[in-house]
Amino acid sequence: MNANQCAAPQTFTAAKTQPAWQRLADETDAIMRSLFDAAVSQYRPRGAVTLLAIGGYGRRELAPFSDLDIVLIHEKPRIEEAFVTALWYPLWDSGRKIGHAVRTARETYSMIKSDLDTATALVTARVVAGDERFGQKVIDRCNIKLRRQSREWLGELHTRVLERHANAGEVAYLLEPNLKDGLGGLRDIHAMWWAHAVGLGMSESDLLVLNECNEVLLRVRTALHHITGHPGDVLRLQDQRAVASEAGFVDDDELMAALAAVARRVMWISDETWARLDPPADRSARSARLAPGVALMNGEIHLADDANPATDPTLVLRVATAAARTKRRIDRDSLDRLGSVSQTWPAPWPAGASDDLVALLLEGERAIPVWEALEQRDLVSRVLPEWSAVRCKPQRNVFHRFTVDRHLWQTAANAALFAHQVTRPDLLVIAALFHDLGKGYPGDHTEVGLRLFADIGPRMGLSTDDVALVATLIEHHLLLPDVATRRDVSDDSTIAYVAQRVGNTTTLQLLYALTQADALATGPTAWGAWKAELVGTLVSRTEHVLAGNSIDSTAWRLFPDAATLEIMAQGNRHIHAHDGAITIVSPDQPGLFTAVAGVLAIHGLDVLSAEAHSNEQGIAASRFHLRAIPQNGWSEIIRDIHQAFDGGLNVDERLAERVATYSRRKRESALGPQPPEVMFHDEASSNATVVEVHAPDRIGLLRDITRVFMQQGLDIRHARIATMGDNVVDTFYLRERTGSKITGANRQRIVKEALLAELG
């Protein structure tokens, strides 16, 4: 046997009829039979010998670079080593990674009793070569022994599933999912098949769904191996477009949506299946009626005997609310009946229906698994047909950890936590559920969402005033974080701008709660202490004004503060760092801000915001707020700033070294780089011109931008830095050296052209 015949992965091409993984398994079978027959012919082993394919190979599921799991079982106590070597060496020589074992039948039966990995691997074993009758006998006896100790194995198997889930991300929501080990991935399907094989019965419909999900995951994993040319289970961002094309999807968005849908179905069936191992403690308790048509029986939520989903459309929400409130599962027969009988809701909704929806939403986190159960039977879109467009829709960026629909559920759950802080908790959770609904449709998601809610709100039976208030929340759901992170919250013009758009304290109160709920549902980077402080300050100042007070009477933290003013009065250079901020006081000269930005970039530090001020005595002060405290302390940074001011540090050279070292390590982000854009906001501040710069992120970008301002004779009064994946939105409050705003279209054009030339 030529070793190259074992190298099937190198010759893989996508199959158009038979699934590629089955075809590759069949081709491998032929190779293994040929190797086995050649070894038997040469060494003639005594007694029955069989070669079993186990694990994925046993299921005929081989991706191009899958491990080849095989076990050689012999009847006699010993088998000639040369015979075994003749089987394995051609595979090793080909570079194929194999998981192999050699055992007697008796050893195999013994291991079944003590080793879960062996036991589960043999569930899908099949004879590839050798004595087929002997091999099948071994397989059958193993299955019998497995079923005899099924309870013990099921408990251990479930424990392993839970341990893996504790360390793995969810396939449905990760930007780069692990197709095999992630929650809702292939291993979860395998675990349920094993559980079913040893006695934890599953319905035919669930098994059919798992087979369909398994095929999608295999199709993607096979394409991944083919595209990358090496083994792996993590679907990296840079490979998703090519994998989508190879696997037959329209584009990478359709691929990730399909994976989300599949993984969520697998997770739900998995949860339902394993729940039967640990039934509710009060399963035998007497049944109780919880709501019209809804009963608690055997520890689960059931449709009552008199329930009729065909004539009672709101029954589905009463069932869901009862399940969330009691933290119980919906009985599968009841859920199936709701799915098969419930109709699309009429317009307008039945009386009290919006109250039922609000009741479910106010259950908070407990409602999320219930929403997922409803989705498994396509019940959410019967309540809200517009929901279909956001179901499993991916948000492929570094901020959002969830699909659009899951993000909306989570935002509503978070909003319920703020219910006691607002006067209209009902409108808060409704706005939370619908604030991003427009993302399922073409166009600006906020504008589309407003048009959608203009139809949904009246259909729900909301009053005209309530529809208008929810619409305001949807329209401005990004207002507070955008303004807080891109504008100077100590500027009166900023406060007036927000107050004019919000209109009253009730709306501001609701918008603040929605902002927090939305950010917390987005991901860990969307709501940190810095942003929370900025938004809180903005809300506090705006609330003061909306209550009828003068903007001038509000108190806020200014820069420079009293301590910095005292240092400035001394007229000397002073650099001081505390926590995540560094303050620099120095005799004023062009380029100080730029020099500090360059030094911070050399040390790999990200700037969140910065302020600058100079007095009539020619002393300048600036303060930079950083994303994180330097790991090695401030001493080297302070030293380099002094050297940069004195001309002893070549910032350009050091930055070039850092760019050469780190830029090539940068990995692709889902957002992708956007073309540079420069915008002037003349009315955003009463005493400075606000310039907003959108650009692809790069090492030293802040320094490059501020150097252009220096060259153009502009002073920086304030800066806000926001990084979003591969892109940044930097906002600067600028003045001419004379202290005036940047006026005149020609002057602004010159500044803009200089910036765009620098940004490339």
Where are these regions (language model features)?
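Active-site-proximal structural scaffolding
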Residues: 80, 84, 182-185, 213, ...
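Conserved structural-core and active-site-/substrate-pathway-adjacent residues in large, well-folded domains
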Residues: 28, 67, 91, 189, ...
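Metal-dependent catalytic core segments for phosphate chemistry
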Residues: 385-410, 607-621, 628
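Alpha-helical phosphate/pyrophosphate-handling elements in metalloenzyme active cores
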Residues: 27-44, 48-52, 192-205, 399-430, ...
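Conserved catalytic alpha/beta cores of large enzymes that bind or transform nucleotide phosphates
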Residues: 96-99, 109-110, 346-354, 358-361, ...
